[in-house]
Amino acid sequence: AGAVGSPHILMLSGIGPKDHLKSMGINLVVDMPGVGQNLQDHPDFMIKYKCLKPVTLWPKTKRLNSIGAGVQWLLTKEGMCASNHFDSVACIRSGPGVEYPDLQLCISPIAMDDNSWQPLKEHAFQVHVGLMRTHSRGKIELRSNNPTDPPRILVNYLKDKRDRELMRKGIHLVRELLDQPSFSDLKGEEIFPGDNCKSDADLDAKLNLHTTSQWHLACTARMGLKTDKYAVVDNSGKVHGITSLRVVDASIMPFAPNGNTNAPTIMIAEKISDEIL
């Protein structure tokens, strides 16, 4: 059921942190402190620029054009709707000596409003800065013992100062990249966070309000040895201490991967399904 749904189901079933389940009036089946803990994601921050040429997707998002794009895709599987519009992605190291790419930069030929998620009404583009291996950890908690109540998702983005420092470094790297001559005929004014937003304090103020998710939540029922009190499943996805129960999704990852979670989740499902079947 995913990194949110799987710990939710386990805790409702009495498998999870003893004190938390008791506070929700749920009978304990197995005291498992790691259920719902260790939540990881790839935090995301968007830098937006005016585009000096009329080459963005903004005109195609107007009502009639968007209807036409939908019809085109239904008939031909081509056109604007055939792309996710992250046409260029770079996985980079934030500096010398960094062991693995710890930043993901994605450029999109349109800029969106952070609140409404509607396109800005001008030719503009945005660059996403994503953290690939965070130090901050969140958690999933029950809101009640009613299965229809959604759980609490506490992501704790940038709580660890190392994540905040890395995000600021990513913003500076994007600005350095966009200042290269190859972008001179495209890059206009920085719309957000703005050319005057340079100090750590100013950037942190923007990060606090505008850091969002890449929707790569994982690691809330992590795989590990039975001797690890925070491990939930073994290397076959079997829940420790429970017979005939497995979890097979992104929640069992011990650490979030250095990239999108879709392909690794498919790999996990393919691998464990061979054992089940």
How should each PLM-predicted stretch be described?
Residues 51-58, 68-264, 272-277:
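FAD-dependent oxidoreductase catalytic-site/capping-region signature
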Residues 1-70, 79-80:
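Glycine-rich loop(s) and the adjacent beta-strand/alpha-helix scaffold that form part
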